[in-house]
């Protein structure tokens, strides 16, 4: 994963590849030139938020239980986000150098730069992407057009009615 290098870390390539994919999508004849939505859950939720920040072509986001958020929480005695690196390696000698790299790619840090419409949802019983980590992302989003749906007894999955709410919300943002 090259987690000790910001320039060679796995997620750098993932994020840059996703931006290139959005560039490609925008060249297709099916693209209307106005509406490019991104939607994903867990790692895909993190990518959706990052893509909306990194690509001006993205017009709206639907992210559910985004991963890669507040990963350093384990270093401070709280539940951390997926992939739980600091849960397993919190005593490593180079942990503070690694934390700098992970922090750079943290979903909550991307969220601070998000000014596009976003629909977000998560379950309070999620053991993969802790609700506290998802809240850290949500609370950082400055966009005035944002909607949050919380399902108290749901884990790392989505109820059908929340899928429907997200879909209707996305359609309401068609330009």
Across the structure, where does each feature detected by a protein language model lie?
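Short glycine-enriched nucleophile-adjacent loop
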Residues: 26, 39, 45-56, 61, ...
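Cap/lid segment of the alpha/beta-hydrolase catalytic domain
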Residues: 1-16, 73-81
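Active-site nucleophile elbow and catalytic-triad environment of alpha/beta-hydrolase enzymes
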Residues: 94-110
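Alpha/beta-hydrolase fold nucleophile elbow
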Residues: 30-42
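Short beta-strand/loop motif that positions the catalytic acidic residue
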Residues: 114, 120-122, 126
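Acidic catalytic loop of the alpha/beta-hydrolase fold
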Residues: 124-129, 156-157
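C-terminal catalytic histidine-bearing segment of alpha/beta-hydrolase fold enzymes
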Residues: 135-175
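Hydrolase active-site cap/lid region
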Residues: 49-93, 158
């Amino acid at each position: 994963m090259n987690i000790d290098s910001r320039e060679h870390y796995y997620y750098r390539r993932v994020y840059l590849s996703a931006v290139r994919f959005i560039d490609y999508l925008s060249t297709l004849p099916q693209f209307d030139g106005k509406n490019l939505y991104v939607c994903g859950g867990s790692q895909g939720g993190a990518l959706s938020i990052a893509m909306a920040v990194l690509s001006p072509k993205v017009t709206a986001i639907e992210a559910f239980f985004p991963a890669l958020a507040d990963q350093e929480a384990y270093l401070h005695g709280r539940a951390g986000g997926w992939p739980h690196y600091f849960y397993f390696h919190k005593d490593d000698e180079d942990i503070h150098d690694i934390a700098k790299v992970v922090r750079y790619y943290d979903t909550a840090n991307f969220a601070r730069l998000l000014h596009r419409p976003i629909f977000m949802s998560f379950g309070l019983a999620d053991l993969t992407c802790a609700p506290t980590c998802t809240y850290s992302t949500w609370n950082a989003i400055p966009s005035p057009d944002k909607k949050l749906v919380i399902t108290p007894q749901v884990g790392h999955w989505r109820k059908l009615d929340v899928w429907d709410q997200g879909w209707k919300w996305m359609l309401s943002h068609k330009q």
